[in-house]
Amino acid sequence: MKKVLTLLLMFGLSFAAFAQMVDPVKFNSKLEMLKGDEAQIVFTGKIDNGWHVYSTDLGNDGPISATFNAVKMDGVKTVGKLTPKGHEISEFDNMFGMKLRFFEGSVTFVQKIKFTKPTYSINCYLEYGACNDETCMPPTEVPFTAEGKSPAVSEEAASESPKEVAQAPAAEEE
């Protein structure tokens, strides 16, 4: 009977430990309007001590790079690449055998967008990798969704085709 109780207790404790998975990075996301017909999707992360989040464009042979992934973007298009902001650390990593770029403490990733229609619907996510000195988390997604009226795109501008310009007749030679 003691063995069964001990086994059940160990199973219960291991289940409780599994339920409290490590979440060393907490992200917030928001849409910031810029001038005219542009905006930016901002992902801001707070990183626990001892952990780091990898930067963008690290290549295929290393850890998971931070990437912007569009599920559905209607009425907007991306402008440029995902841009990391913060104090980026660059150093050789023995575990991966390569020079890596990462952030500790905090990081912000920004994706600029441009509105193309009078209304928009955005469904996207940031994917990132995080490690400490002993382990790495599986690739993690930070979802972002938003919809609304575009700030600087009118119905006319969105549907208007370029106007044909009449050419002036050539001057006659005398």
What are these regions (language model features)?
Residues F18-E174:
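Extracellular/lumen-exposed scaffold segments
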